[in-house]
Amino acid sequence: MQEQYRPEDIESNVQLHWQEKQTFKVTEDASKEKYYCLSMLPYPSGRLHMGHVRNYTIGDVISRYQRMLGKNVLQPIGWDAFGLPAEGAAVKNNTAPAPWTYDNIEYMKNQLKLLGFGYDWDREIATCDPDYYRWEQWFFTKLYEKGLVYKKTSAVNWCPHDLTVLANEQVIDGCCWRCDTKVERKEIPQWFIKITDYADQLLNDLDTLESWPEQVKTMQRNWIGRSEGVDITFDVAGSDEKLTVYTTRPDTFMGATYVAVAAGHPLAQQGAVNNPALAEFIEECRNTKVAEAEMATMEKKGMPTGLFAIHPLSGEQVPVWVANFVLMEYGTGAVMAVPAHDQRDWEFATKYGLPIKPVVLALDGSQPDVQAEAMTEKGTLFNSGEFDGLDHQDGFNAIADKLVAKGVGQRKVNYRLRDWGVSRQRYWGAPIPMVTLEDGTVMPTPEDQLPVILPEDVVMDGITSPIKADPEWAKTTVNGQPALRETDTFDTFMESSWYYARYTCPQYDKGMLDPAAANYWLPVDQYVGGIEHAIMHLMYFRFFHKLLRDAGLVDSDEPAKRLLCQGMVLADAFYYSGNSGERVWVSPADAIVERDDKGRIIKATDPQGRELVYAGMSKMSKSKNNGIDPQVMVEKYGADTVRLFMMFASPAEMTLEWQESGVEGANRFLKRVWKLSYEHLEKGAVQPLNVATLTEDQKALRRDLHKTIAKVTDDIGRRQTFNTAIAAVMELMNKLARAPQESEQDRALLQEALLAVVRMLYPFTPHVCFSLWQALGGEGDVDTAAWPQADEQAMVEDSKLVVVQVNGKVRAKITVAADATEEQVRARAAEEHLVAKYLDGVTVRKVIYVPGKLLNLVVG
């Protein structure tokens, strides 16, 4: 064993060993308990960032720990390879998306290997591989045959720059999240999958996910948004038109004073026929932002249509307005407004001088003051005719029943969740396997023509998808008839919704999944990924699993038992103001900083001497130029140090602040472990440990060792508080370094401790532990070693240290037998000179005893 810890000498050799021995390759083995650990697959952007490193280190720690417990552990990796960034990069670099993507995969694969992640590389997949997406296409055709897929014209957010549809969440301040172009509304035909058919299952099964973060489950519940209410139909005055609204508060119905409709509603169009101002407003609404997160904060605007709806119970006429906060794709595209009891309706009514009629009493039974704001609490009805005096639930039922009886109402369960639009007008994605015959018949691509392969040798002009620009590509024949292929491609969430299942059988060519392999490995035991995926990816992931189950391909109801959402990685951010006042962000690596005595940054300059503004810690990003290249850190400190810092600096689910001083601290710790091991081995062979002959000090040290094993086992396995596990090993190492090494049993105890420390650190720092295990004479490779077991006997304390107080002041510390009674402790305390002198001539009025810890004698 060399004297100095030099990761550059160790890590590449250990990685080569793993590669040659195929250490992490697994197959199904019914004789062993399986464990499937999965981190969300990366997009091959070209370089790993620290967010990747954190995600994959967490997954690797869990995988290695579970393997040491004797389980058959699957930890695969692959590439979420389709997507818009590849098209932009291809245009910029004058290439095609495919070679750019494959080059990035190769580069990032090598980066992952440098970090020592224990993947089964034989299971690697890239979602742009036709052997992968052929089964996605096949499954889509089966969903179509089951009636779960349909095509309809839909209003979408359209980015005129990227020429693609954007999800509501991708519209920021009315602009495209990627290129900042103003977004337009456009009607185009799109393919949808009926996720709404599974809304109740998706909602109810959240209760079975006991090991998922509550935050994620709450976000999904809100996204599904199940509500019970009533569809109410209004007649339109002077017309045969009908107007239907959905409400969850029929108890407030007698307070409805206007109806608001979406810009795309037929009544809006009708009102605009002879009203140019309304037509202009409708056009403005069509092109306005519709991201739901911004709905609550944006300015509420409206315009009257000139039409009136007739209240079906009171017979009163209420005006119909077009409002920018009503969306055609949600519910019926119309809402009844009760401004006295809904804040949004109140703001709109106040702005435009519409009536506000309270119909629910305040909680104290008084009439509510609705001049300053709406009264939104539920309560007793008044001002509601025959329904006066009813409480919320009775009012809800009575008004709903009356509407149903009159034929103008229908009780209904509604969902916020909308069907999944899977069409994208981009090139770099899996072609949607549908064709249109000459007679207009639309049908799935026949199975024997799958996969519909995306041509990869293309020229990108940055404007039109190559498969849309080339009329020849779309031409095909089905049953001898000419047909045209669909030129839209799948939303890339399609690929990432089932990749976890394909990992169980990536080479299987007889079907989408090998049921035997899939049902051996699934569900995933541990999934690791960011909280930002809570409602999109993780919802589709769960939905797809239920589709696979209903197709007979998997047996389980849910795809993953346990979910860990790691926090973001933050770094210092610096900028200076450019010539036009814009912020020019400077990499932290180039910032020369001065700190105060508490380590806070007080001044920063760039290499040219420009003064920099310190913008604090923020998420590592290209936009703020504050990403830290993992490769640079690995080359400087070694992969084990980077991994250890990532797991120690913060609890896994919290944000992590990147501090190079912390990385240096992790490196120093590994050097200490190496140094202690080296010094121990330099003293020669070690005798077997004889537990029966240990001194009290040796027993105490061994007790600390086995308590640490118990704590680290619980911290990694159950609590997943990896940082506290590492802290416990560090604390133990401090004790080991201070322990005497004079006798044979001192050295035998240190040998036991070091072999345990190496195994406890192995999931975090596998390379150095591999080397130390060999040097210390561990059996076989540490990769196949068993996790250390805490010795219950060793943890039993023969004695306890009890603090003795008199009137609350510490007077002595005494050692007593671990099972000593209170009387024995009091007797022992009375023997102490420092205690006895305070008891002389006084009466003990009260005794406070905390067993094994504290004795407080209150005297007077």
Curated annotation (Swiss-Prot):
Keyword rRNA processing: no
Pfam families, per the entry: Anticodon_1, tRNA-synt_1, tRNA-synt_1_2, tRNA-synt_1g
Catalytic activity, as annotated: tRNA(Leu) + L-leucine + ATP = L-leucyl-tRNA(Leu) + AMP + diphosphate
The EC number(s) this enzyme carries: 6.1.1.4
Annotated ATP binding sites: K622
GO biological process terms, semicolon-separated: leucyl-tRNA aminoacylation
A GO CC term assigned to this protein in UniProt: cytosol
Entry-linked SUPFAM superfamilies: Anticodon-binding domain of a subclass of class I aminoacyl-tRNA synthetases, Nucleotidylyl transferase, ValRS/IleRS/LeuRS editing domain
Annotated keywords: Aminoacyl-tRNA synthetase, ATP-binding, Cytoplasm, Ligase, Nucleotide-binding, Protein biosynthesis
Keyword Manganese: no
Signal peptide positions on this chain: none
Motif residue range(s): 'KMSKS' region: 619-623
Transmembrane segments: none
Location(s) in or outside the cell: Cytoplasm
Domain of life: Bacteria
Family: Belongs to the class-I aminoacyl-tRNA synthetase family.
Protein name: Leucine--tRNA ligase
Lineage: Bacteria, Pseudomonadati, Pseudomonadota, Gammaproteobacteria, Enterobacterales
Gene: leuS
